[in-house]
Amino acid sequence: MAILMSAEVPGQTQEGYQATVDALREGIMKAPGFIMHMTAPSEDGWAVFEVWESKKEANDWFAHNVAPALPEGVTPRRTFRELYNVITA
């Protein structure tokens, strides 16, 4: 079953997030196992939510693409949940 990756990014701004996602958008759309990506402001920065086919695919994408693109000092707090159900339009 699919997984939900949640990342809290303390200190991240909308502008900082936008620069990162602009650089990664094309790649994530083609990433094995990627289903969807959403974001929202959080109390102390920015929150990112992604749905992936597996935790391994999410971790591989993060390690090879996201981590190297993050500004120095920005360290997301990532958590994973196995999803019971995903319904799309």
Predicted segment positions?
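Short S/T/G/P-rich N-terminal loop/turn motif that feeds into the first structured element of a domain
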Residues: 1-49, 53-68, 74-89
